[in-house]
UniProtKB/Swiss-Prot annotation:
Cofactor(s) required for function per UniProt: FAD
The protein's name: Mycobactin import ATP-binding/permease protein IrtA
Annotated FAD-binding FR-type domain residues: 15-122
GO molecular function terms noted in the UniProt entry: ABC-type transporter activity; ATP binding; ATP hydrolysis activity; ATPase-coupled transmembrane transporter activity; FAD binding; oxidoreductase activity; siderophore-iron transmembrane transporter activity
Gene: irtA
First-tier enzyme category under EC: translocase
Topological domains, Periplasmic: 314-334, 430-432, 541-548
Ranges per topology, Cytoplasmic: 1-292, 356-408, 454-519, 570-859
Function: Part of the ABC transporter complex IrtAB involved in the import of iron-bound mycobactin (Fe-MBT) and carboxymycobactin (Fe-cMBT). Mycobactins are then reduced by the siderophore interaction domain to facilitate iron release in the bacterial cell. Transmembrane domains (TMD) form a pore in the membrane and the ATP-binding domain (NBD) is responsible for energy generation. Required for replication in human macrophages and in mouse lungs.
Domain notes: In IrtA the ATP-binding domain (NBD) and the transmembrane domain (TMD) are fused. In addition, IrtA contains an N-terminal siderophore interaction domain (SID) that binds FAD.
Signal peptide: none
Coiled-coil segments: none
């Protein structure tokens, strides 16, 4: 087949054809067929990500030598076996792809490549409020991949434009929160007008319909709903009435509305929004700095020009020396150069000092706001994040913001103004030599684009490899005793490391030549060689004065380095803006509000009585984790929450500690709604022991007395005795004065008992124990149970446990399933009922009851 300019360009960017062999074709709908293929080499270049597509070269149905290029989304993939499938809409009249898909037989082959422009859906670290998917039948394969990737608790709104009566027969992926709306096409505005008029704040839009419809959709998303550019993926998959894609010969392409080989990216321009997006958070945080940052950019441009001026004068001084100018003229130019050099340095220092003053004031106010905000956020906000992410927010992001305010804008402006200023000056001196300097720049930009395209699929793989190797390295270090005893060969880390190195070699080795050429293109020696060669030619032919080469020798050789500075300056700017976004998103988090007028306690409710009154709660709107739970906990009793994983046990307990606020209903302690209590007051009534025992850096005594810092040593030791941890503390190197921390040397059960001692000393009337024996060995578990028995005296205790034998003596056992109470009663009552609790017990949850009974006999 003929391969024209398009094929040459693709190959110059590193694209290569792979041969795919058809395995089978399956009719999914009357006009929708799935073609399954296999290619041993395709997935060396391609990455089977959701919504990623491949380029195919289809033969001309008229039998000519032309190949037509079309793009289709990967609907199935098994990279290890080299198998994949694409879905093709069969159009009438049929074009090259439809004709091929209708008639292709198993064993037929076709050329396919993965390079150049394939978009894919990347799951963000921070999920949006929901996904708005907009398209038509050609978009369904890609959207199905997205739907299968989106977590079940994230809503999806899907608008599909119907062009054919059979479009609705195309199967869609399943999702519990997916809502689909088919829109019959009347004109190009039909799809856009069908989008619900609502607040789409923090939603992400993926729009891939026909080109004319996309333009209308884009306008509505931008102008009426206020979607920012970063929250819209807009790409036309086909053009009504015009064939998409290219061909590899001179014959015209047949008209066919199919997915194009080069989908046309549409951009959305930010406009005043009715909604609010996290993507716009950085601009809100930096709004007070807008004028100073703009002014600093203008001043930085002037300072950069002032700093370039001495070099220009130095060049002119050299030209005067060569031409034999007088001493007075030389001294005048020399003193002017020195004066401008000093002036530029002083202006740069003054600008930096001014920006540091602005940054210091802004950073102080920001840190005060951030610390105040953190003190008012619900505890659930902290437990849902690792300490590393919070440290990054408070320390790293604020430092990145310092660079943004004080250095990023001046650096970025200087990186742009300096080469432009140099280039303008050199063009004034001699435009012919200056024009030659663009040669290495074009080479650099072309190679950079090629490397970006070739590395696209590998970048995702590299990120996954990095995450995998981090986990493997941690396991390798933790398993050193076993690895050394049984031999290093028994460790998978070495094999994984070899595979990782092989992946990096396979990725980077083919790019080595281009990277070397890119490095050479920006070196001063390259520019010097070009200047010397071009200048010599012009001087030898009497087209240029030799003295005019001096400016190029002084300034032209640094042109490449100045261009590299643009990337570094803009990189710092992007990092700072991302940090600003993280900080503002935190400042926008919902706080735990305290009602201004606390309600009086209800009559008849004891101070330690806890009431869950028709409580409903969900971590995301519309996805309840706790549903209409009503429950009363009496003083001096133990209430146990049991149920399968994900039933809502820990969530219900944390609601009592007000880690989050309920959506509906109320939780009362002593007759008062906990939302009417300040945090300090609430935690004098409710104490808790978390599933993972938390120790702070301090002595054992300080860890126990965390809630009562002024408690005397005698009270601390009494609490430790009641928690069955006193003897273990005495065995520590310095007893109660031993400094503990993350690596305290205490076992899981011992850490649990230490935190129980902390709760005992706090003497709260209500106590929450989340998985109190989760990390305990049998001996420690027995001691923890003894401590729990002591805690029930005159206290309301809520216990969560998966191991049912630990709560057989609870006064009340509540069985949860999917956030609802399905059973409640004592251990004996629930076993006799033969319901969910009985089934949990029979499946082995109570297998250790004999051990527990034996231990109970010794109490």
């Amino acid at each position: 087949m003929a391969r024209g300019l398009q094929g040459v360009m693709l190959r110059s960017f590193g694209a290569r054809d792979h041969t795919a062999t058809v395995i089978e074709t399956i009719s999914i709908a009357p006009h929708f067929v799935r073609v399954r293929m296999v290619s041993p080499t395709l997935f060396q270049d391609a990455e089977a990500e959701p919504a990623a597509w491949l380029r195919f070269w289809f033969p001309d149905p008229n039998g000519s030598n032309t190949e037509f290029q079309r793009a289709y989304t990967i609907s199935e993939a098994d990279p290890a076996a080299g198998r994949f499938a694409v879905d093709v809409v069969l159009h009438d009249p049929a074009g090259p792809a439809s004709s091929w898909a209708r008639t292709v037989k198993p064993g037929a082959t076709i050329a396919v490549m993965s390079l150049m422009g394939s978009s894919r859906f990347d799951v963000p670290e921070e999920q949006p409020a929901g996904y708005l998917l907009i398209g038509d039948s050609a978009s369904i394969p890609g959207m199905n991949g997205i739907i299968e990737t989106v977590p079940n608790d994230v809503p999806i709104e899907m608008y599909l434009e119907q062009h054919d009566d059979n479009d609705t027969l195309i199967p869609l992926a399943k999702h519990p929160r997916l809502r689909v709306r088919w829109v019959m096409r009347r004109d190009e505005k039909s799809l856009a007008e069908a989008i619900e008029n609502r607040d789409w704040s923090d939603w992400y839009a993926w729009a891939t319909p026909e080109a004319a419809a996309l333009k209308c959709v884009r306008v509505r998303l931008r102008d009426e709903f206020g979607f920012p550019k970063s929250e819209i993926h807009a790409q036309a998959y086909w053009n009504a009435g015009r064939a998409m894609g290219t061909h590899r010969a001179t014959e015209p392409a047949a008209t066919e509305p199919e997915v194009g080989a080069a989908p046309q990216p549409e951009s959305a321009v930010p406009a005043p929004a009715r909604g609010s997006w996290r993507a716009q958070a950085a601009s809100r945080l930096l709004a007070p700095l807008k004028l100073p940052l703009v002014l600093s950019g203008v001043l930085a441009a002037l300072v950069t020009l002032a700093q370039l001026a001495p070099f220009v004068l130095l060049v002119e001084l050299s030209r005067l020396l060569v031409s034999g100018a007088g001493a007075h003229r030389l001294f005048t130019v020399g003193f002017a150069a020195v004066g401008l050099l000093g002036t530029g340095a002083l202006l740069a220092a003054a600008l930096t000092l001014w920006l540091h003053v602005i940054d210091a004031r802004f950073a102080r106010a920001l840190r005060l706001r951030l610390l105040s905000k953190l003190s008012r956020l619900p505890l659930g906000w902290f437990t849902s994040r690792g300490s590393g992410s919070i440290k990054k927010l408070v320390t790293d992001d604020t430092l990145a913001l310092h660079y943004l305010v004080t250095h990023a804008v001046p650096d970025a402006v200087a990186a742009v103004v300096a080469p432009v200023g140099v280039l303008v000056y050199l063009f004034v001196v001699d435009w012919r030599v200056a024009l030659v300097l663009f040669g290495p720049v074009l080479v650099y930009l072309t190679i950079t684009s090629s490397l970006t395209i070739q590395s696209g699929p590998r970048i995702v793989q590299a990120q996954r490899w990095a995450e995998k190797m981090n986990g493997e390295a941690g396991s390798y270090l933790e398993g050193q005793p076993v690895i050394r005893v049984f031999g290093a060969a028994s460790s998978s880390f070495r094999r994984r490391l070899d595979e990782y190195i092989g992946f990096l070699v396979a990725w980077q080795r083919p790019l080595a030549g281009k990277k070397t050429l890119m490095d050479l293109a920006t070196r001063p020696a390259t520019f010097l060689w070009l200047i010397a060669a071009t200048g010599t030619l012009l001087v030898a032919t009497h087209r240029m004065d030799p003295v005019n080469l001096l400016p190029f020798m002084f300034l032209g050789t640094t042109f490449g380095a100045r261009l590299l500075g643009i990337a570094y300056g803009l990189g710092g700017l992007r990092t700072g803006l991302l940090a600003a976004r993280h900080l503002q998103v935190t400042l926008d988090e919902t706080e735990l509000a305290v009602r201004e007028h606390p309600r009086e306690p209800l009559d008849g409710e004891a101070p330690a009585t806890v009431v869950f009154d028709h409580v409903t709660f969900g971590y995301r709107p519309g996805v309840p984790v706790i549903q209409d739970v009503s429950l009363t906990l009496r003083p001096g009793t133990v209430t146990a929450l049991v149920g399968p994983s994900g039933s809502g046990k820990s969530t219900l307990a944390t609601l009592l500690a007000r880690f989050h606020d309920v959506e509906r209903g109320a939780i009362r302690v002593g007759g008062q709604d906990i939302r009417s209590l300040a945090a300090d007051e609430l935690y004098t009534r409710v104490g808790f022991v978390l599933q993972e025992a938390q120790l702070v850096h301090g002595t054992a005594a300080e860890n126990i007395a965390l809630a009562v810092p002024d408690a005397p040593a005698e009270q601390v030791q009494v609490a430790a005795r009641e928690a069955q941890i006193h003897d273990r503390v005495l065995r520590l190197p310095d007893g109660y004065d031993t400094v503990l921390g993350a690596n305290s040397g205490l076992s899981g059960g011992e850490r649990q008992r230490l935190t129980i001692a902390r709760a005992i000393l706090g003497d709260t009337p209500v106590l929450i124990l989340d998985e109190a024996t989760a990390f305990a060995d049998p001996e420690s578990e027995y001691l923890v149970q003894q401590a729990l028995n002591r805690l029930t005296r005159d206290r309301t205790v809520l216990v969560i446990a998966h191991r049912l034998h630990t709560i057989t003596r609870a006064d009340q056992i509540v069985v949860l399933d999917h956030g609802r109470i399905v059973e409640r009663g004592t251990h004996e009552e629930l076993l006799a009922a033969g319901g969910r609790y009985c089934r949990l017990w029979d499946t082995g949850q109570g297998s250790r009851v004999a051990v527990a009974a034996a231990q109970d006999g010794t109490r």
